[in-house]
Design a protein with these regions (language model features):
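Generic beta-sheet signal
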Residues: 3, 131-139
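Acidic, low-complexity terminal tails and accessory targeting/binding regions
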Residues: 71-75, 81-93, 126-131, 147-190
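Short beta-strand scaffold positions
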Residues: 52-53, 115, 136-137
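Active-site signature of alpha/beta-hydrolase-fold catalytic machinery across serine-
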Residues: 64, 144-148
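Active-site-proximal alpha-helix that buttresses catalytic centers in soluble enzyme cores
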Residues: 3-69, 73
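Short active-site segment of divalent metal-dependent hydrolases/proteases
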Residues: 11, 141-142
Length: 190
């Protein structure tokens, strides 16, 4: 089976104190354009199923894909980002550009986060043998699963682009192989 792990589109910034409770931002205008470009790109692929993080930025990213492909979206709590309880959301690219050290923060209890992600993704793999499945999630989730496949400890070893696709093949023997990381050809014209 083939997994397409897709990072959500660009969300809005939410500063601490701007909302009651955890920050769960909607997509920005650019994010909606990215999500539409992704849906156009995936229309040329044969996708059999759609899975998604329950977080708003992921759900809004997958919505045009589901509409275009006429597929139902399944939510999986184990695909939520490690910052799901944060009181603010600042896009990591903004943090990095500003020299803010938070851009490279790893999740609290990275081993636990990785276990949750791997269990969720492997559950999707088990449910879809022989199929191509698109999974809209988060940069931390993609890093955690890719690091698991590669056998590395670094919980955040690369920065997936918004709506980028990382392809992983999952054999019925349990073997996993990464075909690509961070495909973003669908964003060329944005």
């Amino acid at each position: 089976m083939e997994l397409l792990l897709i990072r959500h589109a660009l969300p809005l910034r939410i500063d601490e104190g701007a909302v009651d409770g955890p920050a769960d931002p909607a997509l920005s205008e650019v994010g909606h354009l990215q999500a539409r470009a992704l849906s156009d790109w995936l229309a040329a692929e044969h996708v059999d199923a759609l899975w998604c993080s329950p977080m708003r930025r992921a759900r809004e990213t997958v919505a045009p894909v589901a509409e275009r492909l006429q597929l139902e979206v399944r939510l999986e709590d184990g695909l939520a980002e490690f910052d799901r309880e944060a009181l603010s959301y600042i896009p990591i690219e903004e943090l990095k550009a500003a020299g803010d050290p938070r851009w490279n923060e790893v999740p609290e209890q990275p081993e636990h986060f990785r276990r949750v992600v791997v269990e969720a993704v492997e559950g999707i793999v088990a449910a879809h043998a022989g199929h191509r499945v698109a999974v809209v999630c988060h940069g931390g989730v993609i890093n955690a699963y890719a690091a698991h496949v590669l056998g590395i400890d670094d919980p955040l070893f690369f920065l997936p682009t918004y709506t980028s696709i990382s392809r992983i093949f999952a054999a019925s023997t349990g073997e996993r192989s990464i075909a690509s990381l961070n495909e973003a050809a669908h964003l060329r014209d944005l």
